[in-house]
Amino acid sequence: MLRYSVLSSQTRLLSASRQRTATQLLANPIASNRIITGQRYFADHKNVPPTSPTPVSPESQSVIPPQTVNPVTATPTAQVQTSPPSSIQPPKPPVETPSSSPIPPPTPKKTGRFRRFLLYLILTSGIAYGGGVFLALKSDNFHDFFTEYVPYGEESVLYFEERDFYRRFPNATRHSNRLPPIHKEQSQRVTIPSKSGLSWKVSEEESDSASLTQKGPHNSAVDASKDASAVKTVIKAKEESAEKKAPVKKEAAPPAPKEEPRTPAIATPATLELIKVEGADEPVVQELVRIFNDIITVIGADEGAATKYAAPVSRVRTEVETIGQKISSLRADAEKAAKEEVEKAHALFDESAKKLMQQIEQARAAEAAQFREEFEAEREKLVRAYQEKIQTELSRAQELAEQRLKNELVEQAIELNRKYLNDVKELVERERDGRLSKISELTANVNQLEKLTTDWSDVIESNLKTQQLQVAVDAVRSVLEGATSAKPFIRELVAVKELAADDPVVAAAIASINPTAYQRGIPTSSQLIERFRRVAGEVRKASLLPEDAGIASHAASFVLSKVMFKRDAVTDGDDVESVLVRTENLLEEGNLDAAAREMNTLQGWAKILSKDWLADVRRVLEVKQAVELMETEARLQCLRVES
């Protein structure tokens, strides 16, 4: 229903919008043509009127000549009306004066607010109602509210609950209206026993207990009576329905002879009575009675079982009633004993409460006396403290008054002195204007000269310090370059450090020098070359040794090193002889850094033998690099002073 209403409302809205669109398509070209035909230019081509006949409106069959219609300029895109024809009739032009007929204005566009509001209201109401039904099926509290206050809420919820029930249990009402099946009499059944005929086994006598549990002539008297009564009821119902359906005009057929029902051999037993225990308030007794009543109900449903188990059921009823009476008596005895215990506990509690109240009263009296004494002591203490506070406040107020008076006197004296100084200053200014008018200018010039002198003295001092640092660095270099042997240069380095105490670069350079270098000195270039030649001889001897060489390997390497030829310095190679030749050439050129790099490429025994020489070369390079860094910093400070 809700979906159909929404679709119908959408269809109405679409048809209304189509009608408005068609009306606008009919009206807008006319107005635009009036504007276009009024604007003509010399470059425009004259529009040729269409030769096709003018379409005739559905209401009017009169033919309008094409000369009476205003020419319409062709647009790039033709507008084709795809909507159904509008119900609004176009205006009929007058026949007498077709040129002066006014064109009607376009119809105002309908907003459709009411339809849109109605559509939104219906959609919102439907969604809210559906959501309410869904919540009512999920929540019990909302179910009560929805079915009580919302119109048709209870019917909607019941409808969906029934649908849910039928979906879960599709076979619930399928066999509800059918009649019970008619059972045939036991005498009409023809059965063949399973053990009939011949068999290879010797026949055995069956026990009586097994025959009693099986169906047969010995226990089918009740069933036969039940089947006979059921057949009689069904036959009677069919005859009554046939008599009602038979027509009145036709004579009724003679009824068939009715078969008299056979009387059962055993009389129908009386129904078993349920167990009722008076005063059974205990849950255990009630549960026991309910269980036995269920058993009695099940037994009573079967007539043969009711007769068979009547005596045990009566005995069980008696036992259950006896048990109920015993439980009631035990409960009464327990209640009586509990009541006595409660009375004793109440008496004991009353005595204890009286004793406790007496103790509380005594403790309260003692505490009241103690509190009274403490209160008096505290009151006296507060009185003394209050009096001391009053005395202190009075003394402070008196001191403040005296101090305020002294301050006022001092302020008056200061004010008098200020007035006196102002008078003196005015007199001095007058005198200065008269005789000493140039003193302020002279004082300013003197201050400026003092400032310039101070600045130049700072510049001279920094320049002198920079020159001293440069001299100290040159002294260190001269000691290193002019020495013929290893010579310590501690004094020169200490002088540099004292002169550049505030320079972090010079301090870092001095700290990078190994203490052994400036305490014992560093070897000269000639000493390094001489020592390298000695080390090179040993390296050549061990150049052919493997890492795990023995005595024989050492002897063989020593012999072969004597017959090895010395290579040229420009040869390239990674062998020991090539590295030694290149290193010696670099040492003769004075390039210690490259020589150390070449020797560092050696491996094995050659590198182990040249380890001490490499350490000396590194120490020399570190000292030279530090001295160069200090010289650069000294030059930089000189440039700063000059700028």
Swiss-Prot record:
Location of region: Disordered: 44-110, 173-263
Positions of transmembrane segments: 117-137
Coiled-coil ranges per UniProt: 317-451
Compositional bias of kind Polar residues: 59-82, 188-197
GO biological process assignments: cristae formation
Ranges of compositional bias, category Basic and acidic residues: 236-262
Ranges of compositional bias, category Low complexity: 220-232
Keyword tRNA-binding among UniProt keywords: no
Predominant cellular place of this UniProt entry's protein: mitochondrion
Self-association and partners: Component of the mitochondrial contact site and cristae organizing system (MICOS) complex.
Protein task: Component of the MICOS complex, a large protein complex of the mitochondrial inner membrane that plays crucial roles in the maintenance of crista junctions, inner membrane architecture, and formation of contact sites to the outer membrane. Plays a role in keeping cristae membranes connected to the inner boundary membrane. Also promotes protein import via the mitochondrial intermembrane space assembly (MIA) pathway.
Entry's family note: Belongs to the MICOS complex subunit Mic60 family.
Protein name: MICOS complex subunit mic60
Organism of origin: Talaromyces marneffei (strain ATCC 18224 / CBS 334.59 / QM 7333)
Lineage per the UniProt record: Eukaryota, Fungi, Dikarya, Ascomycota, Pezizomycotina
